[in-house]
Swiss-Prot record:
Molecular function, one GO term: structural constituent of ribosome
Pfam families assigned: Ribosomal_L33
Name of this chain's protein: Large ribosomal subunit protein bL33A
Organism: Bacillus pumilus (strain SAFR-032)
GO cellular component terms, semicolon-separated: cytoplasm; ribonucleoprotein complex; ribosome
Family: Belongs to the bacterial ribosomal protein bL33 family.
Gene3D superfamilies, per database record: Ribosomal protein L33
Alphabetical keyword list: Ribonucleoprotein, Ribosomal protein
GO terms of biological process kind: translation
Length: 49
């Protein structure tokens, strides 16, 4: 089953994106480079709980 997760900017902590993640296949937290409108540049976004 897939669950909805939120991605937060590593620098400012702003929660900018939501996405779906498979429970079974990925044990570690997701880490993606995406655009942060608060920082005004591309930053690393981490999965939040």
């Amino acid at each position: 089953m897939r669950k909805k997760i939120t991605l937060a900017c590593k620098d400012c902590g702003s929660r900018n994106y939501t996405t779906m993640k498979s429970d079974a296949s990925a044990a570690e937290r997701l880490e993606v480079k995406k655009y942060c409108k608060t920082c005004n540049s591309h930053k690393t976004h981490l999965e939040t709980k």
